[in-house]
């Protein structure tokens, strides 16, 4: 493998957890089977010493560092990296949470090869595992009112059938997604009106509106530690998740799906109930 492979900018968003970010970078540098990449860390105005520590480590570990002046959320932070990648002619941007482990060392190579095989692929994601070894089902279908309310249980069963099937899907998981920069330039990156949660659905709509597709690469995977801890969320964390999810869902359902007020509220109420009983 050589620099003839498409160039990839790996973007890691940091907020307070510089230790996880450094560990993630070290894992990439020692395990990832891909030569033509750079790493960029965006610190989202952490309330601790993260920015100072990461800026120092950037020189020692050889990664790009950007200190954001405010914590404007997931989309804004990652857009800094995506736009840097576009401006500096990287062909792909790999959005990677710092609480992810590389289950397969060829995960990036495999996704890039899939992306190169089809010009209309704008976004790819691998299989996502939890710490107990179980895999998260892909989001194959575009959400409908039925799938977001009364039919949500049946939709989950249907999704589980495709865990091991590489295919076009509606959207992938935001903890690990490979973005084709040509497509991101066309759709103007992520919608920065979200803060946390729901960005993947909105990105899926932006890509589809320009006739790009999203691909689920089930043949390679990563482990997402947060997926394993969702059931242990504190009451305050659940309240925060509900609040931010509602903001994102309102934007998604109103401006991207054009649903009326009553339907939007029904969809959000169903989502809130699921979060509370988890």
Predicted features along the sequence, with ranges:
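Glycine-rich, basic loop-to-helix element that forms the pyrophosphate-binding segment
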Residues: 67-88
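A conserved acidic beta->alpha catalytic loop
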Residues: 43-52, 70
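Conserved donor NDP-sugar-binding/catalytic core segment of glycosyltransferases
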Residues: 103-138
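Short, well-formed alpha-helical segments that are part of the catalytic scaffolds
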Residues: 17-31
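Short beta-strand-to-loop acidic/aromatic patch adjacent to the donor-nucleotide binding site
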Residues: 89-101
């Amino acid at each position: 493998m050589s620099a003839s492979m498409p160039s990839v900018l790996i973007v890691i968003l940091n907020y307070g957890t510089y230790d996880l970010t450094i560990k993630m970078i070290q894992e990439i540098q020692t395990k990832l089977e891909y030569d033509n990449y750079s790493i960029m860390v965006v610190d989202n105005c952490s309330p601790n010493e993260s920015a100072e520590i990461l800026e120092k480590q950037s020189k020692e570990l050889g990664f790009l560092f950007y200190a954001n002046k405010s914590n404007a959320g997931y989309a804004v932070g990652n857009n800094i990296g995506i736009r840097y990648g576009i401006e500096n002619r990287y062909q792909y941007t790999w959005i990677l949470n710092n609480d992810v482990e590389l289950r397969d060392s060829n995960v990036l190579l495999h996704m890039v090869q899939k992306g190169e095989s089809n010009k209309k692929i704008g976004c790819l994601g691998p299989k996502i595992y939890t710490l107990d070894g179980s895999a998260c089902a892909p989001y194959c279908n575009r959400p409908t009112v039925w799938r977001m309310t009364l039919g949500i249980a049946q939709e989950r069963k249907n999704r589980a059938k495709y865990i091991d099937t590489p295919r076009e899907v509606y959207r992938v998981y935001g903890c690990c997604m490979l973005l084709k920069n040509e497509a991101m330039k066309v759709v103007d990156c992520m919608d920065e009106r979200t803060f946390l949660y729901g960005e993947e659905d909105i990105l899926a709509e932006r890509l589809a509106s320009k006739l790009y597709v999203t691909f689920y690469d089930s043949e390679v995977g990563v482990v997402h530690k947060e997926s394993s801890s969702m059931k242990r969320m504190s009451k305050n964390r659940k309240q925060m998740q509900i609040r931010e999810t509602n903001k994102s869902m309102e934007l998604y359902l109103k401006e991207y799906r054009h649903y009326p007020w009553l339907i939007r509220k029904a969809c959000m109420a169903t989502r809130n109930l699921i979060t509370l009983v988890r």
